[in-house]
């Protein structure tokens, strides 16, 4: 991965500028893209369904880990505030929405860029520091469909 960053979504569209996360722990980027759920209509005496369609399954998401996060990174992804250089957790669960961008490393003249126009962000400290590793902030980005103020739905993913 050559880039993982976040930005402020526009009105029903993805951000146009992204801030790069300086350090993402190796091996922590995981896509959780779910299969649709099949709904079958069956009739007595018929072996196969007479009709079948797919509906959306669980929401798609991806995760990544930031080792030894700074107070500013904790504020971006966990909410709260930074005061006198220290992060203070929010009193209530925050509502955090961001556009996210991931760019793969180039390979044989190919490179893929993933842009998630609108994501629900949730994060937590998932690993405590020890003598052999740092603490780790695990960030989960759940893909949402952006909707403009005029009610027009935009593409959630490109």
Predicted regions and their residues:
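Solvent-exposed edge beta-strands and adjacent loop segments
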Residues: 1-71, 118-134
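Generic low-complexity segments that are intrinsically disordered, proline-rich and/or Lys/Arg-biased
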Residues: 10, 23, 91, 107, ...
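Intrinsic-disorder/low-complexity loop/linker signature
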Residues: 13, 36, 85-86, 111
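Short secondary-structure capping micro-motifs at structural edges
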Residues: 42-54, 78-91
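Beta-strand secondary-structure signal
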Residues: 61-65, 99-101, 138-141
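Short, conserved charged micro-motifs
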Residues: 72-76, 150-151
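Short, acidic/charged, Gly/Pro-enriched secondary-structure junctions
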Residues: 81-110
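Mixed-charge, glycine-accented linear interaction segment located at domain edges/termini
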Residues: 110-158
